[in-house]
UniProtKB/Swiss-Prot annotation:
Sequence ranges of Basic and acidic residues compositional bias: 65-95, 193-203
UniProt-recorded name of the protein: Protein transport protein SEC9
Region called Disordered, residue ranges: 53-138, 151-221, 246-299
Signal sequence bounds: none
Domain t-SNARE coiled-coil homology: 477-539, 631-693
Keyword tRNA-binding applies: no
PROSITE patterns for this protein: T_SNARE (PS50192)
InterPro entries in the record: T_SNARE_dom
Family matches, as CDD domains: SNARE_SEC9C (cd15857), SNARE_SEC9N (cd15886)
Bias kind Polar residues: ranges: 269-290
Biological-process GO terms, alphabetical: exocytosis; protein transport; vesicle fusion
GO function terms (MF aspect): SNAP receptor activity; syntaxin binding
Protein family per UniProt: Belongs to the SNAP-25 family.
Length: 694
């Protein structure tokens, strides 16, 4: 049993970081301050370098994802980045989910509608699929089959397809229009449409079951009780079978005359169009209840007499019109009387007979347009055409041997001769008169003198010289514009190069600050490792055998104390000098970078003014008839060249500063490497010594 275990001696508790720092400061050992933050002048360039840094990976094709960090890989495998998504967005809570679930349940229940007039949630009137087959026993005029007890406006009739809502047990042959077999009526539970059902089922209202495939073909859609006129036309419309089942439908008013007989029509009523050409041509658009002054199938706008384009058609054969030749293109199509026709109203029959009497004149297609007087506008221009016809004789008597300028002369006209001679005068003669030579006598001579030829040659040479001068001017202007463009491009590239150099030097400044921080930390490690060496030696001395008594020499205690003080003083001075050296290196690096980044960019307004005057004075020897634009180009060329020269000087300074900074940082990095290796060895030795102590 050991002595420590016998006396139950426990090892002391380890000190915290703060306690250790305080203890080191009490014995005079330097520590790192946690409250003071180092001042950084080039932190922005550090962030700039961090943003532009790219991680380069090497991977075979198809295995790039395995080289990425796990966080990035999980993010990619998850949901894609949403630009509208924010970190402040909260997730949906359980309470919100319950509210949403309750809301959906209320929407699914028709009786849960709070507002009796609201149609926003579900529609009980209109079916999105009007031809979809409904359930058996469903209401005939309900698209959803649900009666809305809160909103009575929703319980009205629906205008869907009856074939989709029929009973499944009904006979399919009842809807196929089999001849000789009556149609099975549709059960309608809605009491509002009983009158319409009775009108459809009553044969007196024109409900014909033969050769029918649509129950709406013979019924009067606009009628509730069913008028006699609408029923008659509905009966006649049911005979004609066309491509549209609604061709025979009557849109007349249901309040027409009720006087009906069972006798057939003695005279067939002629109709304009059949259902094969126009499926809605047989529809009647009657308006006033109780008044039916037109037969069914007629045009409701035919009574407008003011419009010349509507006077041609009423019910049957279109008569010839003197104002509109396009109203005679329809052929007569009469319906033969058949048994079982409903006799229309007497007023309608009389009106139809009157219209047939007016349309007795058939159009002769062999008639000439002049005889028919079809186009009225031909009369308007007839007088003008006759006038041109009278003058056509003069064109036939045209003299083909006459010259172009040969025209009739009016000898009595004032100033005729001078004006005519002036018109006939050649261009070159008028130019000679303007220059002051070449009179009428000279022209009559037929030759030119030597002086005239010499003057013409001088004028020609002068024109050539002017053209050459203009060409030189244009060439000078073009060269100057090209020079301005070249200087602009050169200045732009020089500015880009300067910006790149400044960014590089700024990042080197940030790197210099980081190196200084590393050097300070290594210095603290070295100081504390020296104190650790002393503590390890003292611990080894105290942990020796209990029988080995260590007694110091009492005669040299003063000398040992003096040596220790000198050692502590020298160590402190060494640490201080090392810290000053590191600060000096950082200061030199900062001054070097700041001197290269700033300076030389200031421009004085006074200097710019005198520089402009100097440039314009020096450019006059090269300018010819200069204008304001020419002066501006000269000034811009000189300014750009001056800026390029300044940027070139700054680029040289940046290059030199960058080279010096790189050399300095390389030396510092080598020192850091050496100190790091040395400290690694010392720390390893202290660890080994502590392990040997038992």
């Amino acid at each position: 049993m050991g002595i420590k275990k016998f006396f139950k001696i426990k090892p002391p508790k380890e000190d915290t970081v703060e306690q250790n720092r305080e203890n080191l400061m009490d014995i005079g050992i330097a520590t790192k301050s946690t409250t003071k933050k180092p001042q950084s002048k080039f932190a922005a360039y550090g962030q700039f370098a961090k943003d532009r840094a790219t991680s380069k990976i090497y991977a075979p094709p198809g295995y790039e994802d395995f080289a990425r960090p796990p966080e990035e890989l999980e993010k990619k495998e998850g949901e894609e980045d949403d630009l509208n998504k924010s970190e402040l967005d909260e997730k949906e809570t359980k309470k919100d989910k319950k509210k949403k679930k309750k809301k959906h349940q209320q929407e699914d229940e028709p009786a849960a509608v709070q507002d009796p007039y609201a149609r926003t949630e579900k529609s009980y009137r209109y079916n999105p699929d009007p031809y979809g087959a409904g359930a058996a026993g469903e209401k005939a005029f309900s698209s959803s089959g649900v009666y809305n007890e809160f909103n009575n406006y929703e319980n009205g009739p629906s205008y869907g397809n009856e074939y989709g809502r029929r009973d499944r047990s009904e006979d399919l042959n009842a809807y196929n229009g089999t001849p000789g077999q009556p149609m099975k009526p549709v059960n309608r539970a809605t009491p509002v449409l009983d009158r319409r059902d009775s009108a459809r089922e009553d044969p007196a209202y024109g409900y014909n079951n033969q050769n029918r495939s649509n129950p709406y073909a013979g019924a009067g859609v606009g009628a509730l009780a069913g008028g006699a006129a609408g029923g008659a036309v509905g009966a006649m419309g049911s005979v004609v079978s066309g491509s549209n089942p609604y061709g025979g439908a009557s849109y007349g008013s249901g309040y027409g005359s009720s006087a009906t007989t069972s006798a057939p029509v003695s005279k067939p009523i002629s109709r304009t169009n059949t259902s094969a050409s126009n499926p809605y041509g047989n529809a009647s658009y009657g308006s006033t209840p109780g008044v039916n002054d037109r037969p069914a199938g007629s045009n409701p706008y035919a009574a407008i007499s003011g419009d010349s384009y509507l006077n041609g058609t009423r019910s049957g054969n279109i008569s010839r019109s003197g104002t509109n030749p396009y109203l005679r293109r329809n052929a007569s199509n009469s319906v033969p009387p058949q048994a079982g026709y409903i006799t229309p109203d007497s007023n309608n029959v009389a009106l139809a007979e009157e219209e047939n009497q007016q349309n007795q004149d058939e159009l002769d297609l062999n008639d000439a347009p002049e005889d028919a007087n079809e186009f009225v506008f031909e009369d308007k221009y007839m007088g003008r055409e006759s006038k041109y016809a009278e003058n056509s004789a003069a064109l036939d008597e045209l003299d083909l041997n006459a010259t172009i300028n040969d025209r009739g002369e009016d000898l009595n006209a004032t100033g005729y001769g001078n004006m005519y001679e002036q018109q006939q005068q050649p261009q070159w003669q008028r130019e000679e008169e303007e220059y002051g030579y070449g009179t009428q006598d000279d022209m009559n001579r037929g030759y030119k003198t030597f002086d005239e030829i010499q003057r013409e040659e001088e004028e020609r040479q002068k024109e050539e010289e002017d053209q050459a001068v203009d060409e030189i001017k244009e060439q000078i202007r073009f060269t100057k514009q090209s020079s301005v463009a070249s200087t602009r491009n050169t200045l732009k590239m020089a500015q880009e190069a300067e910006m790149a150099g400044m960014n590089t030097l700024g990042m080197l400044g940030h790197q210099s600050e980081k190196l200084n921080n590393v050097e300070r930390n290594l210095d603290l490690i070295k100081i504390q490792n020296t104190a650790a060496d002393e503590k390890v030696a003292e611990l080894k001395k105290l942990n020796r055998n209990i029988l080995a008594v260590h007694v110091s020499n009492p005669f040299n205690s003063k000398r040992r104390r003096r040596e220790r003080e000198d050692m502590i003083k020298g160590r402190k001075m060494e640490d201080k000098m090392r810290a000053e050296h590191m600060s000096q290196e950082l200061h030199q690096s900062t001054q070097r970078i700041e001197g290269a980044l700033g300076g030389g960019n200031e421009t004085s307004a006074v200097r710019e003014k005198y520089q402009r005057e100097k440039v314009l004075a020096a450019a006059k020897k090269y300018q010819f008839e200069n204008d304001e634009e020419d002066d501006e180009m000269e000034v811009e060329i000189d300014r750009n060249l001056d800026k390029i020269q300044q940027i070139s000087g700054r680029l040289k300074k940046l290059a030199l500063a960058t080279g010096e900074e790189l050399d300095s940082q390389q030396r510092r990095i080598r020192d850091i490497e050496e100190n790091t290796d040395e400290m690694d060895i010392k720390i390893h030795m202290n660890t080994t010594r502590l392990a040997d102590i038992r």
